[in-house]
Amino acid sequence: MRYNQFSYIPTSLERAAEELKELGFDLDLQKTAKANLESFLRKLFFHYPDSDYPLSHLIAKNDMDALSFFQSEQELSKEVFDLLALQVLGFIPGVDFTEADAFLDKLAFPIHFDETEIIKHIHHLLATRCKSGMTLIDDLVSQGMLTMDNDYHFFNGKSLATFDTSQLIREVVYVEAPLDTDQDGQLDLIKVNIIRPQSQKPLPTLMTPSPYHQGINEVANDKKLYRMEKELVVKKRRQITVEDRDFIPLETQPCKLPIGQNLESFSYINSYSLNDYFLARGFANIYVSGVGTAGSTGFMTSGDYAQIESFKAVIDWLNGRATAYTSHSKTHQVRADWANGLVCTTGKSYLGTMSTGLATTGVDGLAMIIAESAISSWYNYYRENGLVCSPGGYPGEDLDVLTELTYSRNLLAGDYLRHNDRYQELLNQQSQALDRQSGDYNQFWHDRNYLKNAHQIKCDVVYTHGLQDWNVKPRQVYEIVNALPSTINKHLFLHQGEHVYMHNWQSIDFRESMNALLCQKLLGLANDFSLPEMIWQDNTCPQNWQERKVFGTSTIKELDLGQELLLIDNHYGEDEFKAYGKDFRAFKAALFKGKANQALVDILLEEDLLINGEIVLQLKVKSSENKGLLSAQILDYGKKKRLGDLPIALTQSSIDNGQNFSREPLKELPFRENSYRVISKGFMNLQNRNNLSSIETIPNNKWMTVRLPLQPTIYHLEKGDTLRVILYTTDFEHTVRDNSNYALTIDLSQSQLIVPIASN
């Protein structure tokens, strides 16, 4: 374990003493440091009628227990404080450590003993994470140190778990959206699942916009998947044009219906544990799946601003600008009289994507988004540089396949009976519009590109993204964070994992940082919390996070690739082609072992290199035919210890998100020896070699200059490391699988790897 503490708010002595008193700690500025520490420790054992017993189970020195120490005349020292602090946080002498000083250095322990600062040290200790993954104060509240009185209690600028999660209100409303996506002449209704604590105060809301939450249709999804085996189409030379089109919602009328009290209820919904954490701290949770999902009406428009509007309507309802009904019969309306109108959206992948789309509408009431692994341009999710390009791990998927997966209305047999024919018509229109044949950018994709509206974002934004995420690739977050207005508060966490959540990792206090931010933005708490704009997980060692200023630098270093002419054959034998098509993982294994059709260039680094931004391959290329696709991957190659990309569970249920509520495991990325790590990758149709909107011909056996931008990253390589460049054609995980007999030739003498670099 290593501390990377970003959530602690430095506090004055007076404020620290006041907050400790509010929690019931009987500390006195006039007492000695030793007396105050003893009083603090005894309070921790509030379950015991006699605190001597648990105090005797701690040691103050290697040869003295804590009870004996406090009964003695010995003075409090750094050695004693450190040893007791470690034990209070759950670290066991002789098990987790033998030498406290060395262990504290390894932990990067954030508290440095000064006898005159004991009150502030105790305050800081309470806000510091235990071995279990919870802060000490959260652990104490979890055990019942504070009663669940359904009111707010704060410590160090963060809300504590004092809302009763055993008496939650669970209700359903149906919000009227200014849409008619299935063109049936009726405004679409959007089902909203609400979970909120009982409280006399207006509550802020965490909203998870999740098209998955009302169920998914995996059977329809699998039937809709596309075969990747097809020839790369030779496209006609042309220029692509698109236009920015404002989304125009339909008109709605003020509702004059009576207020209903008898709301639909529910017992369970698959919740997001970060939401659960805030539910226990006085934040309502709502789950919304949007148009075309079970319980709602309309068509699943998948990614456009009509879908975004169906979520926006819910924020409008929370602020009194839209109507919600108690049921589909629309006999009574219901108002969000429990809400304070301020909303933060949460969720990963599609969920985070909807958060970005919502933010670009500038809707009033949306105070903040926490968008994890989020898409900012749907074209860049299903296409790349004029190619059909599947997200990592999902060859054959496309946006209409995702529509089939998430159109959960068809999971309700009655809805299927009444609406499936119309749904199939609209789905066919969507399949035509996305133009899988060419892989080109068009108006359909432009209407699903949130980057063009990034200037309209006015809420605070928090993004998290894995630099090993080949599903929602790093370019998605790179482009949105660099398009954000300079006037807003923005925060980016870049981790070394893949397509994963990070709120329950041991090495970063993400959960507590979000608590401080949300208390600021949604509860109006003046806590003086300041979070860096960007926090990056160092790839060279375990559990080390650093502040960075920017994602993407303008300083570059050009690395020569050699002097040879390299030939890349596209064609595979029939058996090999079928085997790779059947299992793309077998292809990846062969590729990284140098056994696929590929060209390899190894670059031995003569100095440290901190990559920050978009690596570009500038290549001199020719194709034996009038077509060609180019794939590239950059590896950190050679045996050494590296971070894994999937977090593993360190404990099973050590994190309590309330008071015995929604427990979850503590996780972390492992640090193990392996043979390589992918730094970046990229794909291009050579007919789109200059830009996305220009389709050009490929002259047979004529040299072309190609600039292939790879996925942005921040990655630290050290002197003596090997940077491996892999150039090839068909990628069996991502691209179409064209087995035609053509070859690419690369002139390395006129090719470079252009690397954006930053100082370390």
Swiss-Prot record:
One Gene Ontology term from the biological process aspect of the record: proteolysis
Reaction catalysis annotation: Hydrolyzes Xaa-Pro-|- bonds to release unblocked, N-terminal dipeptides from substrates including Ala-Pro-|-p-nitroanilide and (sequentially) Tyr-Pro-|-Phe-Pro-|-Gly-Pro-|-Ile
Keyword hit for Nucleotide-binding: no
HAMAP family: Aminopeptidase_S15
Enzyme class: hydrolase
Record-listed E.C. numbers: 3.4.14.11
Family listed: Belongs to the peptidase S15 family.
Active-site residues from the entry: 349, 469, 499
One GO CC term, this protein: cytoplasm
Compartments, record wording: Cytoplasm
GO molecular function, one term: dipeptidyl-peptidase activity
Listed Pfam families: Peptidase_S15, PepX_C, PepX_N
Role this protein plays: Removes N-terminal dipeptides sequentially from polypeptides having unsubstituted N-termini provided that the penultimate residue is proline.
Name the record gives this protein: Xaa-Pro dipeptidyl-peptidase
UniProtKB keywords: Aminopeptidase, Cytoplasm, Hydrolase, Protease, Serine protease
Keyword presence, Protease: yes
Assembly with partners or alone: Homodimer.
Gene3D superfamilies in alphabetical order: 1.10.246.70, alpha/beta hydrolase, Galactose-binding domain-like
